[in-house]
């Protein structure tokens, strides 16, 4: 099984949390204290992320990752689940809902990738700066992240709240990025692709972006015409590329509102 997972069982529905490229399942920590009150949590680590070994034979494109997660859901014999994905994880969630509608109850995409009219044909020079910085600074990160200068350098493009962000969240993010052998394979697997699949209107779908997302900016990477026609589109103020960090309570509320639309 290419997907590493941790299932936290409770009463209520099952929420499946899918992280982004170069991230890991611990990116969801700020969300969990509230979300755990509403159901079971299935935390995933994609290949080459979060300590999950990278198998070079595994296809890393979003549709293939969606299929791998579908196999896991079937293996665990879960009822229809509620998908929550960030960035690449949001794209994977959308693909999964489109391909396996019987397994999915709802989708909440947090700054999902793939919503661009013109697919990227190659890696854009400089856009892997966060990866290179994390790799170079991993040894000094525990100390460096206590300084505002290091926080600004590493996270000002990710969150407008970089000054007040929890230290452990920042350290987890740097560690995950520096150790993510799947970062470049996942990136390359998105080239010449975009999300253009159809999701049944039976599956409530919400797309959430922050107004301060500089990773997937609105001008090029937030094309509403590619989202399901029935999807609710929300823009949160003073929120960056990781809404679950900047506004965890609002995100949980949005998730529950999406879940409540299931018929």
Would you name each region that the model predicts?
Residues 1-17, 36-40, 67-80, 229, ...:
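Alpha/beta-hydrolase fold catalytic core
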Residues 3, 29-30, 42-88, 120, ...:
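Active-site loop/oxyanion-hole signature of alpha/beta-hydrolase fold enzymes
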Residues 7-54:
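Conserved HGGG/HGGXW glycine-rich cap/lid loop of the alpha/beta-hydrolase fold
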Residues 90-101, 107:
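Short glycine-enriched nucleophile-adjacent loop
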Residues 98, 107-138:
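Flexible "cap/lid" loop of the alpha/beta hydrolase fold
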Residues 142-199:
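Conserved alpha/beta-hydrolase catalytic His-Asp/Glu region
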Residues 179-226:
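Conserved serine/cysteine hydrolase catalytic core
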Residues 239-252:
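Catalytic histidine-centered segment of alpha/beta-hydrolase-like enzymes
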């Amino acid at each position: 099984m290419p997907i590493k997972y941790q299932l936290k069982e409770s009463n209520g529905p099952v929420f499946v949390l899918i992280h982004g490229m170069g991230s890991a399942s611990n990116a969801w920590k700020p969300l969990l204290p509230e979300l755990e009150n509403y159901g079971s949590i299935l935390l995933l680590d994609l290949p080459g992320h979060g300590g999950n070994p990278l198998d070079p034979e595994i296809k890393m494109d979003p549709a293939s990752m969606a299929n791998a997660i579908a196999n896991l859901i079937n293996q665990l014999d879960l009822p229809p689940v509620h998908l929550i994905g960030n960035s690449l994880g949001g794209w994977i969630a959308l693909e999964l809902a489109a391909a396996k509608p019987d397994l999915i109850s709802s989708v909440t995409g947090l700054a999902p990738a793939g919503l661009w009219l013109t697919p990227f044909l190659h890696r854009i020079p400089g856009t892997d700066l966060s990866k290179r910085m994390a790799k170079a600074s991993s040894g000094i990160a525990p100390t460096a992240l206590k300084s505002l200068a290091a926080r600004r350098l590493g996270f000002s493009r990710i969150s407008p709240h970089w000054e007040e962000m929890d230290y452990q969240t920042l350290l987890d993010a740097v560690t995950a990025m520096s150790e993510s052998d799947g970062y470049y394979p996942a990136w390359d697997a998105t080239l010449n692709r975009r999300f253009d699949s159809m999701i049944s209107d039976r599956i409530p779908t919400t797309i959430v972006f922050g107004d301060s997302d500089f990773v997937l900016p609105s001008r090029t990477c937030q094309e509403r015409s590619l989202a399901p026609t029935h999807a609710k589109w929300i823009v949160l103020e003073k929120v960056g590329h990781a809404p679950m960090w900047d506004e965890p309570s609002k995100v949980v509320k949005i998730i529950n509102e999406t879940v409540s639309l299931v018929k």
